[in-house]
Amino acid sequence: LALVQLGGSWGLTMDERIAGTMLITALVFAVAAAPIFLFLKERAQPRASSLGALTSADGLWTLAGQSFREICSTLKSLGRFRDFAWLSLCGFLYQSGIAVVITLSAVYAAEVMGFTTVDTLMLVFLVNITAAVGAFGFGYLQDRIGHKRALGITLIVWVLMIVLAAMAVNRPVFWTAANLAGLAMGSSQSAGRAIVAILSPKTRSAEFFSFWNMALWLAAIVGPLAYGSVTWITNNDHRLAICVTGLFFAAAVLALIPVNLERGRRVAEETDAASRGTTSDH
């Protein structure tokens, strides 16, 4: 933000200043990731067959086939893990809405609210601060009121944010909506992952988290595609498009209702017990 604000006095054009922020972002990523690569020990041991497969094209196709079969196996088992299935649907729905906020909030701010580039960068900066506060604060709230209830509250905050953004005709209202988005963004993602950990059998945690991530990646496509389709059909009616985005969050609230954490935890524990029994028999 300082580069964008002060870069003009250094003779930099706006394009050069924005490009410079990308370099700063890359540096921040490198610094943040360095401790992981330097100090975090890898406990999992890769399968020798998988390492060998990476050295040839046929081996890569074999690994891809195995991965696809494992995804199909996870899908078939969702009938038993119905609480995880409902949670995955909930995550897909609310992440579709979040993907719109992340990728298209700058477009909405510029087209509807008349934000300049500097205004938009300031918006992103402050929203990230409120996202950090939301993730930290709601972490304590989750421990006090429960993960499902905390996630439900954040989804309602998302719905309120959409209503404010769609109705905003002045900047203070839009800024309020943006900061609500920041508070809900960090907390909804952390609450979702916490519930996945509860509903996942320990012996299949990587499989379940992979399926959860796949649902979120699919949402990153569906959400912006839905927003873009509405603006294209309605000749750039961004307010209607953001209202449609709100339907994702409203549907996520409904998908969260059937999730029963105690039942899901019990099924996960039974699966682990059965897995240990099978292992001991061998």
What residue ranges belong to the model's regions?
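A membrane-interface helix-boundary motif in multi-pass transporters
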Residues: 2-27, 229-249
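Juxtamembrane intracellular "pre-TM" segments in multi-pass secondary transporters
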Residues: 42-87, 281-282
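Multi-pass alpha-helical transporter architecture, strongest
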Residues: 28-39, 243-275, 281
